[in-house]
Amino acid sequence: MHTVIPHTHDTPAAAPVRSGAVAVVVGTGRSGTAAARLLHHLGASVRIVEKDESRVSAEFASLAARLGFDCRYGSHSAEQFAGADILVPSPGVPVASLLPYLDASRPPEIMAEIDLAARCVTSPVLAVTGTSGKTTTVSLCAAMLRAAGKRVFLGGNIGTPLSEYVLDVAAGEAPADVLVLEVSSFQLQTCTTLRPEVAVLINISANHLDYHADMQEYLDAKFRLFALQGPDDLAVLQSGMEELADRYALAARREFFDAVRRFPRTALLGSHNMANIEAAWLACRAFGVTQSQAAQAVEEFAPLEHRLEKVDEVAGVLFVNDSKSTTVDSMKAALESFDRPVLLLCGGKWKGGDLVSLIPVVRRHAKAVGLFGASREIFEHAWADVVPMSWDHDLQTAFRRMTAMAQPGDVVLMSPATSSYDLYSNYKERGGDFKRNVAAWKAERDD
């Protein structure tokens, strides 16, 4: 018999920040902007720190002037952080890089934007973290909860910062029945008050080792999601994490999931997505979602862009955009999703991982590998004797090389296992480039 999670946040924590406290926000992206607006709303004195003034949009500059933010641009210095009571680094800004500039005799309270906002909410929280599949899983959770008639806020590391939701509710918008939050290791590292009624860890493997000091620090950050849970809360974890759950002394009730095909009517590909669906179901039934409601949501759920996205099938060749694949494990899951020969496009800014462990999977599924961008030597060192490989400076040339080899029944799969920052601004831009190449190749064949 599963437990329906009670509504535990009757009132938000009193005085989330002290009125007049000096709050320093590092970064002016969407998360930093939302944190600054919320801090101002709560009565803090807001200071903005940004190393690169060219990143500051005209819209933010206008907001800062209107609300009276103290903006300090340029290379970090002790002066920028002097007198700070609160420090909110934007996701992706390593806290360690800021420590040399802080007053050790009077250190500020360091908190993530999502942690700040969590102090202000009354609705129960369903939070999801993991190395890969977070966005698909939280989107599935939102779909299942909505199928059950619940009002849902979906945000955090995906799309809308939680601070924007808090401000909208303060302005009169109806609160959500459930807050569904995607939470990254960057955010969790500075979370001290976030307590989800349901916390989900879908998987964990080497990632962001260009940010975290080592795998242990990354693991510690992920398990902070469960740190404040109590026995009335629910922790949902992948099977095989039982020992980790014991090591981190999880206090919540635990449920473990496998990649079972409980909901067979779905457009999602791969066993990893079956695991994502099962994790979402275990999380959502705690809020009263029935299996039939979940099944309806899964059947209607469209695969998300850049995540094993079927772009087109031309002359019997299937083109799949998995640009969001930035880890070795996500590439493995992508390759195992097909029983057809795969022409694999990969490469980019290396984030860590064990490519040698993929040799059996590459042998079984990959017909050829087309590398592009950075990390050439890392891939070649691991796979040079395993599969035919080529390397090109850019995706377009590598794409042309793979399509020249493609035959009916093949799959041209871009699953890079790396970040995109060597050639692109983000994974979405990389995925868009792949899709443009597919469209151009199709148009040439139609001529």
From Swiss-Prot:
GO-annotated cellular components: cytoplasm
Keyword list, A-Z: ATP-binding, Cell cycle, Cell division, Cell shape, Cell wall biogenesis/degradation, Cytoplasm, Ligase, Nucleotide-binding, Peptidoglycan synthesis
Pathway(s): Cell wall biogenesis; peptidoglycan biosynthesis
Reaction it catalyzes: UDP-N-acetyl-alpha-D-muramoyl-L-alanine + D-glutamate + ATP = UDP-N-acetyl-alpha-D-muramoyl-L-alanyl-D-glutamate + ADP + phosphate + H(+)
Disulfide pattern: none
Pfam hit, one: Mur_ligase_C
Annotated positions binding ATP: G130, T131, S132, G133, K134, T135, T136
Parts of the chain that traverse the membrane: none
EC number, UniProt record: 6.3.2.9
Source taxon at top rank: Bacteria
Subcellular location(s) per record: Cytoplasm
Stated role: Cell wall formation. Catalyzes the addition of glutamate to the nucleotide precursor UDP-N-acetylmuramoyl-L-alanine (UMA).
UniProt record similarity statement: Belongs to the MurCDEF family.
GO BP: cell division; cell wall organization; peptidoglycan biosynthetic process; regulation of cell shape
GO terms of molecular function: ATP binding; UDP-N-acetylmuramoylalanine-D-glutamate ligase activity
Main localization of the protein described in the UniProt heading: cytoplasm
Stated name of the protein: UDP-N-acetylmuramoylalanine--D-glutamate ligase
